[in-house]
Amino acid sequence: MKMHFFILLVITSWLSEKITSLPPDSRVFDRHGFPDNFVFGTAASAFQYEGATSEGGKSPSIWDYFSHTFPERTRMQNADVAVDFYHRYKDDIKLMKELNMDAFRFSISWARLIPSGKVKDGVNKEGVEFYKALIDELVANGIEPSMTLYHWDHPQSLEDEYGGFLSPQIVEDFRDFSRVCFEEFGDKVKMWTTINEPYVITVAGYDTGNKAVGRCSKWVNSKCQGGDSGTEPYIASHHLLLAHAAAVQEFRKCNKTQDGQIGIVLSPLWFEPYDSASPADNEAVKRALATELDWHLDPVIHGDYPEMMKKLAGNRLPSFTPEQSKMLKNSSDFIGINYYTARYVAHIPQADPARPRFVTDHQLQWRVTNHSNHQFGPGEDRGILQSHPEGLRKVLNYIKDKYNNPIVYIKENGINDYDDGTKSREEILNDTFRISYHEDHLQQLQKAIIEDGCDVRGYYVWSLLDNFEWEHGYSTRFGVYYVDYDNDLTRIPKDSVNWFKQFLDVKNKEIWDVSHKERYNKTFDDVESFEASVGSILYLMTNNISRREEEERDQCAFGNLNDQSGLLLESYNSFGFLENVW
């Protein structure tokens, strides 16, 4: 018997190495078609989900101030209650589990954890307890917590005191906030994001003024209460990058986070030329990608801004000191990507130099259709995002080719349905367009991984629930669960819920059918069973075939094979060698 064990040990060691090194099968479109340990999750943010804005010691954030002071800019709606995740998180985590999701990406409210924004004024114990309870509930349900430090909602007090991200003071306050998070939650949270979508924060917050803090030049938007669209986007972005680097420094010093990973999340669209025959439009595409991606990716990888951004912005783009550059370089363990849609780009002449602003510095204009009136995909006519799944694959290949194939996670991907009050609940629940959107994007993601070699390791759906969508209020719905805002915020599954359940349901399927397991429940002392099992393993070693290829063979062929070689493939798994490999 000792020899039997020795032979099996050698064979299974060899086979395990071969099986686990096999690539996923691109012909299989479910969880099995993605690499081992690929993470599927849903995503949310504190302000859009939690509610309870005046409970638990929380102070007003910039979005509380923005939505209450200028309600006309958020459709006369606010997130005081949002979807009440603060009180209902346990039930919502059950929904995640029922969806067969692996992870949940959420953000921590700086204003809830440190109400004044400054550690010297004290950490809010109730805030710490809430997030610890949330994390514990996730872990207890087998859901991996993925925490974002900043998703657009710093305390309004920092805005009042020194102008928020327009001041370098915020870098050290963000460092302190991050340190508290790592010390309090780092033992159970291993996936961290520093800043969510710095491009959106700076452009929408400081150029167009559509989002908090709502600043811009008066000639851009008369509703803005102050600002300079030509300089402030670059200044705020600069401090966001330095805040990211400061947080990463603290992360890498903290003992509790040594086995974790941290990165930044960017939000690129994909771009194609408005007129593919126009050299100017093709050059405009390069500038668009430089502003959407390279502007923030170059610093966290190389330690400096890309040359194109320096050329476009001139002396309005701040520069990094040597120490800052060193701090920024290689400051992301992974790159998070939020991808939603694509646009055509047309070159435009240089704008009036007397009225500089970020969106015209780059001499381009986004278009929904190209010069032939062709659009990327369905959606815009329904008030929802255009679906262009090929753009996701192209974004990933752009990053792979330009930045030496870094680790990437898709941190958000989803599509909205515009709810103007005229649609019935049944219409909204029947979200076949959302099913198609996710299916198409996951197929392109699978191709990017398997065929192109992009190192992508996770995909997060935006979002689990309908929620407060910033300046759009509650008029646009991204959730796979419908939230009935008129009926106690009841969660109702849309059709996409069943699609995701089925897509992810194969997580724990065994590699072979073990319905006859008891029939072949032999011991190593049974020589006949032992020889049959070794024969099965040797057969797999020499043929190197997958489960699915086996199942496609004619069943009578297996019968002949068993007759000729004594192979009992059904008994293969009775020893449990390859449980849950895929």
Swiss-Prot record:
Superkingdom of this protein's organism: Eukaryota
Keywords from the UniProt entry: Disulfide bond, Glycoprotein, Glycosidase, Hydrolase, Signal
Active-site residues from the entry: 197 (proton donor), 412 (nucleophile)
GO BP annotations, alphabetical order: carbohydrate metabolic process
Coiled coil: none
Sites where the protein binds a beta-D-glucoside: 48, 151, 196-197, 340, 412, 462, 469-470, 478
Entry similarity comment: Belongs to the glycosyl hydrolase 1 family.
Name listed for the protein in its UniProt record: Beta-glucosidase 28
Protein species of origin: Arabidopsis thaliana (Mouse-ear cress)
Gene: BGLU28
